[in-house]
């Protein structure tokens, strides 16, 4: 046996790997590797790593016994990690649409403001979101009970005309079956209870199956990093992507809640009959005992959901076995006893009106509104911080902004690039910007400056080689002291450090009318300071809605659950009672909730008009900027308009906080009004408006009619979309894009939410990078597009610090800061991104102004070293026909970043910068 020593080898003979991770919508390995012949190296049909066929043996032992791997002349071996089947998969994934409210409320858990871990406010925030998720489970099962028990078994089967209209209900009708065995109300309810029970069982099965496939994928087992340290982020914890214990616990609690909801719907109807004067004493006592048992079961469910949150600081392989098995089993036993109790013979019992328990939906709506308000208070306190003062906010007028540079390196003249107000979050901010912005206001602002270092700066700290330098992650300059020198400005080594200039990136490129420096960064209404690391302060000033994104999204999830519940109830009621004369219909509250939908649509229509006006004004201003950048004066007006329109439309993503704020606030207010109207009058809006003025009566009639029609139409469209996605792969991929964003996060608030694909993808990438770097000692670039960049960053965080320093990160079209940094500030906020920037060997980010998803990472300044962001890429590459582009260049937006020459340049610089130490075996 020979000993293994570590010696330095030049980059020309080092093992190098380029790991490609695709984004939303998926991709094939053939397209990612640009080769029709690919082979699967590791993985399965769901997610796998592929290589070109010619590179299949790149990791095989070399013929020379002195080296551990074959020498490929320094050429990086490209690998493609394909994970699209994790979200699009087979046709059954289309059924995940039914779980959309659960997914939305689960997102709210991860949207909390940045705060110190372990505080009571942080724990309270998670507890409130879990309770909101529990209320959605109860709401969904209650809606199934409303359809099966109330509308079908209680009302329709108990009405001769309705049962005669639907012959399949004849055996349940007391008149049509001539008093058959199933005709008593209790037995009808017991039989109909099988429908919501089966729904609960289906949800349990889907959650259990996906739990075994996703949450049970073990990440790398390693020591946790210090809590609340300067480089601390929850994404670096060993157990972050291993939620096996919590999901099992929540699944037990939510399953029991669903079964107890069914038992309560059946048992309360029978108990009310037994509690009347002259009722059978034995059944009366059993009914009261059953009610106490159901209340105790409900308390046990709430305790199980609230008692424990996530355990992320270690791989928690334990399971609460007794709770996981006994709680649902106990609830099932109670449900069985309730069905037997309800089916007992009760002479003279007849069904009339609506099923008792009509107030259930009102109680759920009240509880959800209270939880959202409490969540808002907690989120506001977390965002303000412990001192009670809001985090400092820097905007585009901050005098500390770094100097902006043109392609020539000179400061931009004030009359060439102007600034606009920072991207607004609140309704007042956006109204002011949209209304006050004149048509002639230039919207072009300085691009992020191209990174430079003074001669002699290396971007590395020689005095403390083990400490990640503030200059690491530049993507250029030497990686190690004594690296091979390069020519001045090459960015490869020597004393020039980070030496390529803005002229190399975005300067004038000849007669092709290609653009000069770009515009403002997406999501940034202002200049450079808004993009500097730490611009948000500890509280994150760029956090969406001032840290209230979580409560707003939780409100939307509850509203979506209400719309789905009301929609299915309304459609089934209309189907059973075609003339509207047989049945009392669904609960009054559901009718009120449907009646306020037209008002919500009017508000959203006004908001769309406001955003449309702003986009139109911005497009006019962008036309001037486009003509100046491409030297296209006069140019082609249609071509200029398309480019300007693409840029202005891309900024609509940054208006997302406004849309969410207006929608959630309006929904909360209208929901409160519907609750007051339903409980205050006990009548539908039309009946409640009788005797009022003609205008009020007309508004009530229009609202109720339109609301009923709209909610039914929405339900039909929802089912149609799901059915189409079940059969059509392209539609399934479209739904997969929704899941790409919504199911990135683990299931922390709702076990019935669609599974978190990152709990499979992140361990896959982490294991691949860790094992490869340890086996070869080589260099590695992980390249992520769109959502793949979030996976790449999450995987890098999961590496050991020593392995993290051997990894370079290339992101393009990345939503890491533009979406994740704003909506999830506790996990992708400035502090977390700065820590990642310092830990990895180098990081470069590419984006376009026409990209509605990707944007800058905004890391620059003295606190984190030189910038990560490349200046905005030109899109299109050329305005007209040129030698390099004889045909009109397309506007690429979010796709085909590899088509830009800057991509190959940045990729080459990252690979050249990594100079690893490779283990060499000596006899």
Residue ranges and their predicted role:
Residues 794-798:
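Active-site signature of alpha/beta-hydrolase-fold catalytic machinery across serine-
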Residues 776-779, 805:
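Short coil/turn segments at beta-strand junctions that form active-site/ligand-binding loops
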Residues 783-792:
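Gly/Ala-rich beta-loop-alpha elbow adjacent to hydrolase catalytic centers
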Residues 766-776:
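Conserved acidic catalytic loop of the alpha/beta-hydrolase fold
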